[in-house]
């Protein structure tokens, strides 16, 4: 026992040393094993000898070891004790309740049951600190320390690089390793810790909860297995993480790089313009409040759990998938192969080429904007699609109900899904439908576009521009207010095409087409049979139907149309004006009601016409057949050797320049207004009338009534029909037929010609109602003349051996004996005439 003085002693082989109230300095000269040293009050110092010492101390402010393995136990609560145990594998244990110590060169420190404060004033390499119960604190010195820590609630580092390992579960502690490149490793049982100034964090198999209370500028954390969570502070943080299942950011800018695969993990980087970079692994991550997400080279699956309003997501290589949250999102993406939206309105912009991407933005009013690349995407549930500057290929994977698509510049292609779609389209060069009813409206000019809407009852509406488009499988096509040029590349069956205002053109494909057309100025058919019905007025139409047996039906309007290569034409209820620009061969034309007009081209035309009020032929030979009973029509067949065949039911027509007119079994009333040469007219059976309005040369058969013109008419009556002929003014010539004819020459010097006995045989006499001796002449063919001819007046005929004639005043009958046998071979009744009225000069033989 030392006295109450300032003592300095060296002791040996003493098991217990007790000091007093002053400062004692004790040096152990021999090994101390199991002894107790209590130097009492004062500022005491103990120096251990160079032995493996085991000592329990109390009331000592400084303990110095030398070079061996010392085991020191603090027997009482201490404050301000300094322990430096020097070399060797040293141990320090706090036996009493609580210690505040500064230590150096101690490899193992064991704390007490209450709060301990341990400060290192020398480098610690491989030391272990277990401060037991209580709210303990470990302060590392400004050295490069390597320590294992257990049951320490607060660890504070220095200005150098510290390496700290938790030796057991860490619950609720705080670690601030200060300056330097510091490293912290967790025990396999997990840790709940608040960190600052730690550059590397490593976890094991336990569940770790790491919260950063200071800015992180270069953190690398791998929390290993378990359900781990990392919370960043409200600072500008930069971290590299692996094996963290939940990452929470602060209110400022966080930059997070994932260095390991993430599977089912959750990341919420809070406020600020945050950035997340995924590793080159197959990642599955749920992300919130992250403005920039960068993927690696593998397959990334990213789910956004919060609204993004200015996000950029580039998932790099691999078949990546992005799922948006149920918010109004605005995001820019790149290298994402699958994008799925939710129930709100999303705006997605592609910042890189999309190749084979699938985009389904779910409910809401969504918008997709493609970048200026050659993009290929499949899109569903997007209300607005905007393309870029290059060629975009867009396929709709779901039903389109009122969406707007503008693919911008480039040779773009749009494929609709197999649904009943309604879309508004601009700047798309190719549109393809599948099998349902599509309603497509173009809002921009179509130049060289190709549109095939596939099966179903489809509708296409063009915009008010000068459009050039090739279409197929469109059942209803509506043009705009400008000129549209439409080519149909597939068969049309029952389609309706109305190209609206403008000078429009429609070209049909080489198929058997059936369609209804309105407001198309030019129609060009193919090589097969086209059946076209006009649903609107045509005022200046030009239609060329090409090869095939084609049919055109006009609408009930006042139409003006030029046609070619048309086999059947049907008019409407109003006045139609039809001009054939090409040869008509076997064409059937029925212009129906209205005052209609048909003009044939300068070809050898063959047509059957009905209900045409005015027909004009060309300069070549026309063959015209009336397919219906004509009533008041005018037909001028022009130059050429033309033929007109009347309808069998009877016709009333005015004809000009028809070289041959043939009637049927009905009653015909034919007026010939002009002729370019000799005519052949056979009006067939029925009660027929022929009226001439200008000088005509014609052979006529089957006409019961013939009325001449004021000009010179040269008529040859053919056949046995009993004709009533009135030739009017002019020096006319009529050759009697084989029937019992009634002939009226009218004014002028007329010739009544007989070329055969049967033309006015005995018992079948013709009647000349107005024979004027001195001006009119009875002309007989020389083939009937025997010898000479004499007129015998009222004398009875006798056998003279030469031709002779006599007149019976009672019956006003001229008897002609052509062979001179004294018997009349012919009889001609001359109304109102007597034998004295006639003379030899009234007869002519030629």
PLM regions with names:
Residues 3, 20-22, 29-31, 40, ...:
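Extracellular repeat turn/loop positions enriched in glycine and acidic/polar residues, especially those
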Residues 5-13, 31, 51-55, 78, ...:
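Feature detects tandemly repeated or modular, low-complexity segments in exposed regions of proteins
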Residues 9, 17, 26-28, 37, ...:
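Hydrophobic "rung" positions of tandem beta-strand repeat architectures
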Residues 43, 138, 181-184, 411, ...:
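Short, basic/low-complexity N-terminal boundary segments at the transition from targeting/disordered tails
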Residues 59, 87-89, 103-105, 133, ...:
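A short, compositionally biased
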Residues 660, 705, 721, 733, ...:
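Acidic glycine/aspartate-rich repeat arrays in secreted/surface proteins
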């Amino acid at each position: 026992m030392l006295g109450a003085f300032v003592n300095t002693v060296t002791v040996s082989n003493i098991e217990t040393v007790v000091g007093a109230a002053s400062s004692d300095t004790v040096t152990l000269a021999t090994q101390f094993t199991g002894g107790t040293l209590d130097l009492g009050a004062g500022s005491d110092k103990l120096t251990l000898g160079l032995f493996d010492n085991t000592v329990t101390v109390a009331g000592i402010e400084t303990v110095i070891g030398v070079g061996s393995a010392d085991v020191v136990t603090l027997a009482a609560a201490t404050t301000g004790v300094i322990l430096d145990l020097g070399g060797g594998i040293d141990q320090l244990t706090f036996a009493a309740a609580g210690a505040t110590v500064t230590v150096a060169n101690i490899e193992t420190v064991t704390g007490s049951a209450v709060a301990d404060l341990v400060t290192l004033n020398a480098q610690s390499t491989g030391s272990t600190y277990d401060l037991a119960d209580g709210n303990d604190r470990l302060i590392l010195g400004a050295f490069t320390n390597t320590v294992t820590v257990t049951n320490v609630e607060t660890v504070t580092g220095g200005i150098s690089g510290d390496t700290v390992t938790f030796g057991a579960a860490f619950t609720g502690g705080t670690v601030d390793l200060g300056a330097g490149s510091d490293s912290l490793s967790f025990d396999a049982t997990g840790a709940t810790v608040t960190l600052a100034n730690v550059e590397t964090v490593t976890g094991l198999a336990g569940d770790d909860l790491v919260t950063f209370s200071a800015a992180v500028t270069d953190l690398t954390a791998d929390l290993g297995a378990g359900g781990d969570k990392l919370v960043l502070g409200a600072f500008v943080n930069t971290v590299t993480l692996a094996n963290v299942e939940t990452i929470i950011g602060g209110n400022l800018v966080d930059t997070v790089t994932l260095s390991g695969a993430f599977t089912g993990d959750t990341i919420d980087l809070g406020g600020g313009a945050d950035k997340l970079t995924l590793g080159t692994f197959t990642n599955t991550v749920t992300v919130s409040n992250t403005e920039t997400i960068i993927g690696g080279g593998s397959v990334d699956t990213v789910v956004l759990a919060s609204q993004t309003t200015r996000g950029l997501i580039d998932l790099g290589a691999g078949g990546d998938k992005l799922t948006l949250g149920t918010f109004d999102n605005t995001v820019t993406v790149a290298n994402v192969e699958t994008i799925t939206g939710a129930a709100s309105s999303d705006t997605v912009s592609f910042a890189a080429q999309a190749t084979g991407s699938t985009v389904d933005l779910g409910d809401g009013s969504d918008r997709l904007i493609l970048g200026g690349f050659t993009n290929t995407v499949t899109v569903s549930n997007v209300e607005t699609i905007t393309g870029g500057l290059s060629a975009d290929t867009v396929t709709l994977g779901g039903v389109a109900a009122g969406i707007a698509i503008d693919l911008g510049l480039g040779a773009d292609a749009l494929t609709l899904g197999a649904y009943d779609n309604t879309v508004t389209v601009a700047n798309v060069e190719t549109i393809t439908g599948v099998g349902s009813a599509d309603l497509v409206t173009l809002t921009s000019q179509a130049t060289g576009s190709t549109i095939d809407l596939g099966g179903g009852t489809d509708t296409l509406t063009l915009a008010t521009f000068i459009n050039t488009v090739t279409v197929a499988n469109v059942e209803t096509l509506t043009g705009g207010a400008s000129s549209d040029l439409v080519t149909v590349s597939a068969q049309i069956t029952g389609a309706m095409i109305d190209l609206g205002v403008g000078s429009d053109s429609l070209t049909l494909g080489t198929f058997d087409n059936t369609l209804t057309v309105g407001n198309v100025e030019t129609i060009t058919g193919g090589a097969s049979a086209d059946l076209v019905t006009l649903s609107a007025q045509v005022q200046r139409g030009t239609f060329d139907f090409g090869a095939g047996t084609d049919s055109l039906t006009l609408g009930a309007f006042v139409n003006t149309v030029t046609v070619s290569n048309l086999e059947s034409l049907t008019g409407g209820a109003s006045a139609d004006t039809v001009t054939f620009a090409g040869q008509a061969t076997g064409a059937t034309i029925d212009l129906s009601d209205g005052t209609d007009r048909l003009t044939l081209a300068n070809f050898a035309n063959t047509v059957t016409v009905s209900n045409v009020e005015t027909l004009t032929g060309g300069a070549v030979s026309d063959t015209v057949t009336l397919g219906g009973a004509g009533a008041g029509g005018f037909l001028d067949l022009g130059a050429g050797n033309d033929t007109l065949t009347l309808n069998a039911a009877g016709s009333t027509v005015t004809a000009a320049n028809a070289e041959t007119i043939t009637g049927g079994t009905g009653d015909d009333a034919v007026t010939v207004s002009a002729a370019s040469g000799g005519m052949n007219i056979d009006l067939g059976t029925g009660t027929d009338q022929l009226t001439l309005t200008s000088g005509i040369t014609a052979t006529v058969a089957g006409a019961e009534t013939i009325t001449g013109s004021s000009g010179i008419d040269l008529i040859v009556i053919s056949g046995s029909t009993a004709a009533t002929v009135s030739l009017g003014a002019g020096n006319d010539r009529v050759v009697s037929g084989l029937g019992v004819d009634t002939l009226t020459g009218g004014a002028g010097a007329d010739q009544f010609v007989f070329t055969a006995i049967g033309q006015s045989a005995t018992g079948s006499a013709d009647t000349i109602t107005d024979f004027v001796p001195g001006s009119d002449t009875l002309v007989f063919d020389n083939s009937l003349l025997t010898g000479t001819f004499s007129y015998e007046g009222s004398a009875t005929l006798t056998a003279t051996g030469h031709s002779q004639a006599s007149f019976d005043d009672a019956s006003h009958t001229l008897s002609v004996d052509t062979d001179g046998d004294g018997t009349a071979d012919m009889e001609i009744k001359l109304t109102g005439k007597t034998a004295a009225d006639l003379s030899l000069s009234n007869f002519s033989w030629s």
